[in-house]
């Protein structure tokens, strides 16, 4: 099925919208109300993404499932630890997937980024390693913040800290993607070879 490319503002809204809902509901009520609202917003964002583009990015699916699982545990057990450790699980999982993929000669970052660009095998290797280390670092950082700071501080960090950090890191990878950019011979070849680090 063909994928419709969404408007950048729509993509931004589906990614940041749930986080803003989480922040404002927590500020108005409490973390448990914010968790419930966050779960609803995540599902709404995925539905909107599918309606508009007929496609849901794999990262959004994985994140959504983990949010629903840990959000449910938070509400049922009335224990905010689960929603706080959720980012650690997500970052750790992404780091493990990327690192494990490299061991088998694959760069799953191509799938995670929805094949936004085409790189040489060396480019995929470097980019994958960088993102694996980034996700591992973010997992550690989340653990430090939620274990040593207040709930409100953690929420602010999650909404206004993580997003800028991720954007800055992603922008910092642009020289790498330009240096190792590869023009595909065909769309089929591009999709077949995307993320294959065994060549070259």
Swiss-Prot record:
Gene Ontology CC annotations of this record: plasma membrane
Residues passing through the membrane, by range: 7-27, 32-52, 56-76, 93-113, 126-146, 153-173
One Pfam family in the UniProt entry: IspA
Subcellular location(s) of the protein: Cell inner membrane
Keywords, sorted A to Z: Cell inner membrane, Cell membrane, Membrane, Transmembrane, Transmembrane helix
Superkingdom in the source lineage: Bacteria
Topology of the protein relative to the lipid bilayer: Multi-pass membrane protein
Record bears the keyword Membrane: yes
Keyword Glycosyltransferase: no
Function in brief: Plays a role in cell envelope biogenesis, maintenance of cell envelope integrity and membrane homeostasis.
Family stated for the protein in its record: Belongs to the YciB family.
UniProt-recorded name of the protein: Inner membrane-spanning protein YciB
Source organism of the structure: Bradyrhizobium diazoefficiens (strain JCM 10833 / BCRC 13528 / IAM 13628 / NBRC 14792 / USDA 110)
Record lineage: Bacteria, Pseudomonadati, Pseudomonadota, Alphaproteobacteria, Hyphomicrobiales
């Amino acid at each position: 099925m063909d994928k419709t490319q969404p408007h950048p503002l729509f993509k931004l809204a589906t990614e940041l919208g749930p986080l803003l809902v989480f922040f404002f509901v927590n500020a108005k009520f409490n973390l448990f109300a914010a968790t419930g609202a966050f779960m609803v917003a995540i599902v709404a964002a995925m539905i909107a993404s599918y309606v508009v583009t007929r496609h849901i990015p794999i990262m959004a699916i994985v994140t959504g499932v983990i949010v629903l699982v840990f959000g449910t545990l938070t509400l049922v057990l009335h224990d905010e630890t689960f929603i706080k450790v959720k980012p650690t699980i997500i970052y750790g999982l992404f780091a493990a997937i990327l690192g494990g993929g490299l061991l088998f000669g694959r760069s799953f970052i191509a799938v995670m980024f929805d094949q936004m660009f085409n790189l040489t095998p060396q480019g995929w290797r470097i980019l994958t390693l960088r993102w694996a280390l980034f996700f591992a670092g973010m997992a550690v950082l989340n653990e430090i913040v939620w274990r040593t700071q207040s709930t409100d501080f953690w929420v602010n960090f999650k909404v206004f800290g993580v997003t800028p950090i991720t954007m800055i890191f992603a922008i910092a990878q642009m020289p790498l993607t330009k240096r190792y950019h590869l023009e595909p011979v065909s769309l089929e070849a591009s999709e077949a070879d995307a993320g294959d680090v065994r060549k070259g």
